[in-house]
Amino acid sequence: PVFAHGSEAHMVPLDKTLQEFGADVQWDDYAQMFTLIKDGAYVKVKPGAKTAIVNGKSLDLPVPVVMKEGKAWVSDTFINDVFQSGLDQTFQVEKRPHPLNSLSAAEISEAVTIVKAAPEFQPNTRFTEISLHEPDKAAVWAFALQGTPVDAPRTADVVMLDGKHVIEAVVDLQNKKILSWTPIKGAHGMVLLDDFVSVQNIINTSSEFAEVLKKHGITDPGKVVTTPLTVGFFDGKDGLQQDARLLKVVSYLDTGDGNYWAHPIENLVAVVDLEAKKIIKIEEGPVIPVPMEPRPYDGRDRNAPAVKPLEITEPEGKNYTITGDTIHWQNWDFHLRLNSRVGPILSTVTYNDNGTKRQVMYEGSLGGMIVPYGDPDVGWYFKAYLDSGDYGMGTLTSPIVRGKDAPSNAVLLDETIADYTGKPTTIPGAVAIFERYAGPEYKHLEMGKPNVSTERRELVVRWISTVGNYDYIFDWVFHDNGTIGIDAGATGIEAVKGVLAKTMHDPSAKEDTRYGTLIDHNIVGTTHQHIYNFRLDLDVDGENNTLVAMDPEVKPNTAGGPRTSTMQVNQYTIDSEQKAAQKFDPGTIRLLSNT
């Protein structure tokens, strides 16, 4: 038996206990040592040793790790002894809550209770967004810069959907009252998660749709997977009522290969009325056979190459701290919260410039997205998804997998938002925070002198949202040189169109690829764009900022000499939204500075 404090210790298996706790467990056979990683804690411990190394510092163990029949055992107090030792300083207790902290689960529930008690509230009402109603901007900056408390009650914005009618309310959580209740005219509400379920049920139980499926060789509607899509705006030319709550449904066949996206049921669109809970119209084109070639994407048909482990270690702990929802790294401080529509919102971003805390950005987030497709055919012409506004990209946050979606040294943050019933829902691993090496920051070698090089470090805030077939990855990247970058991209699966052509030598290939590219037998990837828009409320050294355009130009040389051309910069101020509406050109520069 093993004893602790004079009595027999209760031992539990190390692997199972630590993995259930959420820690990564690694065994070094050469060093005969365990490495345990959990959030900001990096622990090394040898079997039989009376000490462990936690973030580079020694910690006495009341009970050592014991090996028995080839398995490691630890005391049932091991997790508390090691991970609650205080040696991991990544997470700090927030003594003064930031005024932009997300609504807690309790606050979300309180907002729903208050709203449901209103006489205007209808039983069938659903919730599209419940979020913080932001206090006065000047007061928030005063808190961030001087620590001045914000003298305002916590307030919530509640957006609801009563049938097809959108309602916006503002709720005082402290005094438990509704400050405003505003029906929004001429607006469509977001597509909610239960709408997906409703559409699938409507399709599965429709005898009319089942008959149409037979034209495509499908006799079992239960194998049809639906994707509910917004109908777009065509000013009545599509024969649809713009004020109705409608979705267009394109379908795919589940063939059992785990990738129904590769099996589109082409030229078949069902128009579903969400209020009437029925199909009101079926739009068809020429029948195209469903591509049936198995195309799994989970690796079942591949032999992955054997690779040796790649480990990222921080043996002395993190270089950043997280206090509540505020993150501090080197000279940067910023607040982070998750919004159900736009995802992460970074606020009160400051940079410590030799002891002076300088304002950089009050708030930054994704503003919206649009994904327009360029194919005019019946199943494609209406596709121009507003992923953020129509579907809620924060709601569709994809939990991040450490070691795959983010490096193994990442800290994963859970976030809480409201679902369509108003119930608080926690998304595990919603945001990843990690530091990485990013090459040389500076290098110069002067002849006859020693080399001068400095390392570049970056702090990354990563978030992933899965909207249908696409998985969007967004990185906010903080550089130690005072730069903030945004990297946006997509992975997932291409949205494809079923066609007759198997190769580009087939008779129909030219027409089949008019609006896309043949990427597999009978499958075309249609031409489309992903356009990201970001909302950046920059306050560089204050709110009196000016946006300046700097356009490089080649001009004739008028200064004399043999050179015929020069490179100059045309600089001008952008002082209106009309001037700001410009075509994207990566060769131009936009400078925002304090004036």
What are these regions (language model features)?
Residues 1-96:
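Primary recognition of N-terminal secretory signal peptides and signal-anchoring hydrophobic helices
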Residues 5, 42-49, 59-64, 167-174, ...:
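Short amphipathic beta-strand/extended segments with alternating polar/hydrophobic composition
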Residues 7-12, 67-73, 147-153, 162, ...:
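Short, low-complexity cationic-aromatic patches
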Residues 12-17, 73-74, 79, 111, ...:
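Short, structured motif recognition centered on aromatic/hydrophobic residues
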Residues 26, 33-40, 53-56, 94-218:
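Post-signal-peptide, soluble extracytosolic/periplasmic N-terminal scaffold domains
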Residues 46-52, 62-68, 172-177, 203, ...:
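A short, sequence-level motif marking secondary-structure junctions
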Residues 73-94, 161-176, 265-269, 274:
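Hydrophobic, ordered structural segments
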Residues 137, 189-595:
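Beta-strand/loop-rich accessory regions of lumenal/periplasmic or secreted enzymes
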